[in-house]
Amino acid sequence: MRVGRLWIGPPWEDPPADALAVVVDPGRAFGTGAHPTTRLCLEALLELEPGSLLDVGCGSGVLMIAAALLGYAPVTGVDTDPAAVEAARANAAANRVEIDARQADGAGAPLPEAEVTVANISLEGVVALQPRSAVVVTSGYLVSERPELPGFRHEIRRQLDGWAADVYRRESQ
């Protein structure tokens, strides 16, 4: 899958020579990179100013790896599934990028601070977040839904195949 200058695909496919390649073997974890919500989040990351990044519900690490290749640093990801954390770490190593993947409950425990938070999870999960970031990219829900993030103003909505992603900026920014 090509998104701007990024290419996301499995290890058995060859990326285009002009692309930043995100090679992903999902293993038992969620996330091959092909879902419309992943594409929407990647489009948002391509347009934002890189800084520190937190990926809530990191799955196989697609968004974290892409962010690291785009210059975001440091990159941290949390997921409730230990198989996802293991897959994210393995995929990051295979892509030669540095990330910090941790098992954590994003809705229950305090989240690490980052300039940008990306959350490609259910609408309920997005609403439960209390991010401490300047910018929040949300997805994982239908176009008929839109999360409300107190203290943030809505900036951009993207839609693809019935799915949506939104970019929010902290009110004081």
What is each stretch, according to the model?
Residues 1-32:
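Non-catalytic substrate-recognition/targeting regions of SAM-dependent transferases
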Residues 14, 61, 144:
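Surface-exposed, flexible loop/turn segments at secondary-structure boundaries
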Residues 16, 172-173:
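Short, charged/polar, Gly/Pro-enriched secondary-structure boundary elements
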Residues 28, 32-107:
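Conserved SAM/SAH cofactor-binding pocket of Class I
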Residues 43, 80-169:
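S-adenosylmethionine
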